[in-house]
Amino acid sequence: MFAVVRVRGSAGVRRDIADTMEMLRLNRINHAVLVEDTPSYLGMLQKAKDYITWGEVDQETLTAMIRKRGRLIGGDRITDEYINEKTAYGSVDEFAAAVFSGEVKLEEAGIKPVFRLHPPRKGYEGIKKAFNEGGSLGYRGEKINDLLKRMI
C-alpha cells in the first residue's frame, strides 16, 4: 500500500495531470491518500510524479495518521468507541492493521479517504526536483514514513 502526498500546487498544471490528481483525490497541497499497489494506480502516480511524492507506508505511520489526522464524514475525529461500534474491530490500532493488510477500506467504515496534513517540520527538501536528485518529488520508498511523521 502506498501513501501519496501532494507537494505542489495547481498553477500551470496540464489538464490531463489535473484530472489524474482529481481521480487520486489530491486537490490541495499537503493532502495525502492511501492507494493500492495496482498497475492502474502506478500509472496514475507516474503521470503525476512532478507534483506528488509517494512510497510504501508502514503500519506504525498508518496508525498514527488514522488516529491523529483521520476524520469521519462530517468532520469528527475517529475514536475507539466509533470503530468498536461501526466495525468488527475493537480499537483504532486493530482497524489500522486491517487497513494495512487490505482487509478493509477507510470508506467502508465511514472515514474520509483524504488526510489533511500539516506542512512538514523543517520543510520539503525542494519542490522542483525529484527525490533521488535531492528534492521531494516522485517515488521515495520507505522514506515516505519519515515525511509523514513530520507532517502529522
From Swiss-Prot:
HAMAP family: Ribosomal_uL30_A. The keyword Zinc-finger does not apply. Belongs to the universal ribosomal protein uL30 family. One of its GO terms (molecular function) is RNA binding. This is Large ribosomal subunit protein uL30. It holds the Pfam family Ribosomal_L30. The keyword Zinc does not apply. CDD domains: Ribosomal_L7_archeal_euk (cd01657). One of its GO terms (cellular component) is cytosolic large ribosomal subunit. One of its GO terms (biological process) is maturation of LSU-rRNA from tricistronic rRNA transcript (SSU-rRNA, 5.8S rRNA, LSU-rRNA). SUPFAM superfamilies: Ribosomal protein L30p/L7e. Part of the 50S ribosomal subunit. InterPro entries: Ribo_uL30_ferredoxin-like_sf (IPR036919), Ribosomal_uL30 (IPR039699), Ribosomal_uL30_arc (IPR005997), Ribosomal_uL30_CS (IPR018038), Ribosomal_uL30_euk_arc (IPR035808), Ribosomal_uL30_ferredoxin-like (IPR016082). Keywords: Ribonucleoprotein, Ribosomal protein.
